[in-house]
A protein has these predicted regions:
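Residue-level signal for inorganic ion chemistry
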Residues: 27, 138, 238
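Solvent-exposed beta-strand sheet faces enriched in polar/charged residues
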Residues: 58, 81, 124, 219, ...
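Active-site oxyanion-binding pockets that recognize sulfate/phosphate
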Residues: 6, 10, 30, 34, ...
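Acidic/His- and Gly-rich active-site-bordering loop/insert found
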Residues: 3-118
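Metal-dependent amide/peptide-bond hydrolase catalytic core
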Residues: 4, 197-282
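Histidine/acidic-residue-rich, glycine-tolerant segments that coordinate divalent metal ions
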Residues: 65-66, 85-93, 97-98, 103-104, ...
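Conserved short loop/turn motifs at secondary-structure junctions
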Residues: 33, 124-128, 276-281
């Protein structure tokens, strides 16, 4: 790309800077979590419509959208992907309030400066990145297949054009035991909480025996009730990551063995909800 076009693109973005920064601040204050980004989605869609994009809302997910502009040619279809969900209880700690304004700014700049270049621009709003993996759902429903190439940005303290991307697997596991009074008849109980705690301990033991880039995290969603009752139900959530999808598959297999062992040791049963996987960078 010539320096002249770069200067033109920069000038357009500078002229929209105040609007884009205000938009980012507004989205930051809303801090809508995954799947509930209704006001945020409307802010982004309305601005794109004002700038001449044709917007289709609810594309695969309620808060997703697809905004298009073309100059009547048969050139390449260029995608710009934006995320905008916040983290539950902490807000926009991952910087997704910046992606929508940044992506819209890029799209407007290209639209204004490349009128004579054959191309079609598509801005995809991809919600629920922090939980469901909105892009995966949209791909499975047939969206984005039109794109010849796609770009996205992510907030960071550094400027880079080549970032790594970890594969991720997320599981919600419900352990089932037998309820009993913890003081009068503990021998009759089978603790679902014990099963979850044993699985946590096993993961800690596993850390020494996996590759350095492996990340394993867990939390208890539902511990089961008061301490004087052997809990018959405990719900735990686990997240596993690696920079290699292939290696993560091996870790997942070992994780399933941990669940089997924890249930066997405690005389409990369990069921697994496995969320859509995120693949590592190709």
């Amino acid at each position: 790309m010539s320096d002249d076009i770069k200067k033109q693109l920069g000038a357009v973005i500078d002229s929209y800077k105040e609007d884009l920064c205000q938009m980012a601040d507004e989205i930051f204050d809303l801090a809508e979590i995954s799947g509930e980004e209704y006001k945020t989605s409307d802010i982004l869609c309305s601005y794109l419509e004002k700038e001449g994009f044709v917007v289709e809302r609810g594309t695969g997910l309620e808060t997703a959208f697809r905004a298009t502009w073309d100059n009547g040619s048969d050139g390449p279809v260029i995608g710009i992907l934006v995320e905008y969900d916040a983290l539950e209880k902490i807000g926009h700690a991952c910087g997704h309030h910046l992606q929508g304004p940044a992506g819209i700014g890029a799209a407007i700049a290209v639209k204004n400066c490349l009128q004579d270049y054959p191309c079609r621009l598509v801005v995809y709003g991809t919600p629920a990145e922090e939980t469901l993996g909105g892009k995966i759902i949209m791909l499975d429903k047939g969206y984005m297949k039109e794109l010849d190439l796609a770009f996205m940005s992510h907030g960071s303290p550094n400027t880079s054009v080549d970032e790594k991307c970890m594969a991720l697997e997320n599981f919600v596991v419900t352990f089932h035991g037998v309820k009993s009074h913890a003081a009068i008849s503990p021998e009759e109980g089978r603790s679902a909480l014990d099963a979850a705690l044993l699985s946590f301990h096993a993961i800690e033991m596993l850390r020494e025996h996996v590759k350095d880039d492996t990340r394993m995290h867990y939390t208890i969603r539902n511990a089961g009730g008061p301490p004087n009752v052997v809990p018959d139900l405990t719900v735990a959530e686990y997240t596993l990551r690696s920079y290699s999808t292939k290696y993560l598959d091996e870790v997942v297999e070992r994780f399933y063995n941990i669940l089997k062992g924890a249930a066997l040791m405690t005389g409990t049963t369990y069921e697994v909800q496995r969320d859509l996987p995120f693949k590592s960078k190709v």
